[in-house]
């Protein structure tokens, strides 16, 4: 288990150094770093994560909302919906 610790620490340091580089900060990378911190620092209150989840749910597109696909890999539709034909639609097979 101890041999896994150095690669994990290296990844965390690499992610933080990317954030320090400057103006090219990516919101998804920043969120990844924020979400991975509780694993190393359990003192952070859970209230912040509830607020983050509520903010993410408000920011997502609901049924028939437009969903521009200008950021590949970024989910613009709420959970259970997919971006099809420029709108948030129900997933195929449901």
From Swiss-Prot:
Q: Which tissues does the record link to its expression?
A: Expressed by the venom gland.
Going by the entry's taxonomy, the superkingdom of the source organism is recorded as Eukaryota
Disulphide bridges in this chain?
60-78, 67-83, 77-88
Keyword entries, A-Z: Disulfide bond, Ion channel impairing toxin, Knottin, Secreted, Signal, Toxin
GO MF annotation list:
ion channel regulator activity; toxin activity
In this entry the propeptide is located at 23-58
Of the GO CC terms on this record, one is:
extracellular region
Q: Where in the cell is it found?
A: Secreted
The reply on keyword Membrane is no
Kindly indicate where the leader peptide sits in this chain: 1-22
**Would you identify the family this protein belongs to, as annotated?**
Belongs to the neurotoxin 14 (magi-1) family. OAIP-1 subfamily.
Q: Regarding domains, what does the record say?
A: The presence of a 'disulfide through disulfide knot' structurally defines this protein as a knottin.
Query: What is known about what this protein does?
Result: Probable ion channel inhibitor.
This protein is called what? Answer: U27-theraphotoxin-Cg1a
| Organism, as annotated | Chilobrachys guangxiensis
UniProt lineage? Eukaryota, Metazoa, Ecdysozoa, Arthropoda, Chelicerata
